[in-house]
Amino acid sequence: MLAKLPSFENYSYSCTEIPNTVFFNRIYFLNAIYLVPTLVLNIWIFIILRIRHADFYKNNLTFSIITLDTVVAIIHIFLDLSVVRLFLYFPQFCPQFSQYFINYPIINDIIFPLYNYCRVSKTVTQSAIILSRLGCVKKPMKSDKLSRKLTPLIIPTTVFLPILVILNTVISKKEVVFWYGGFFTIYHRKFVWVSLSSLHLTFLFFAIAIFIFSSIMIVRHLPPHNELAERNCIIHAVLAVFGFSLQGFFQSYYALFRFQEWFPDFVIHGQFVIYDVMTVG
């Protein structure tokens, strides 16, 4: 799901026949091997938090944010498996289904912003979770009271912030384009100076800074000799910073070089794996 027209050699304006259709089908199935279990796991987590034990978790800020993160992950993976990667990696579907997206632009008006919202949301929810944990560690005796007080404020804020990043995709014109036999969507920015890549990159920088700062503060405020908690906190921080850094490198690379003739094709495929690090992790 790209921001503007790139200069790919195999880019076209209609479905094209390619000899290695099975190769791209296999890419989809390889992605599905880890995305389907992740989808099932997120659905199970949601059932636990909001159905089976809703009374226990509903007033806890951290678990409320985790619930939000889980819902977004479910939507994200569902869109990947049923729309985005399906129609990119299955050229067999291109002639029929691309026409639906072209003739009924409302489909892309909904799916394109929603998909990018899910991508950005992980940056916000993970930052909110680590800040919530920091609050629990610094003020353990008041954590329940603070949780009940802050939940009505934090949850709407966490939902709203990603909208700032994807707002230009909501109001901009979308276009169906064709690549390697499949198709996907781009948008032509209504406000040229507002880039999805640059805004997301800004959020990523803040998320990395928040994770590093919060993790250091959590370790400092943990009870002495609590090595297991310290190790888990450090591992979580390292993995999160690594995942966000990968996204940051991609957004930087894409923002700087996407219009160059030598821009490599594998970057489009690689972006899915980069974002999957945080979705699956």
What do these predicted regions represent?
Residues M1-G281:
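Seven-transmembrane-like multi-pass membrane architecture, highlighting hydrophobic TM helices
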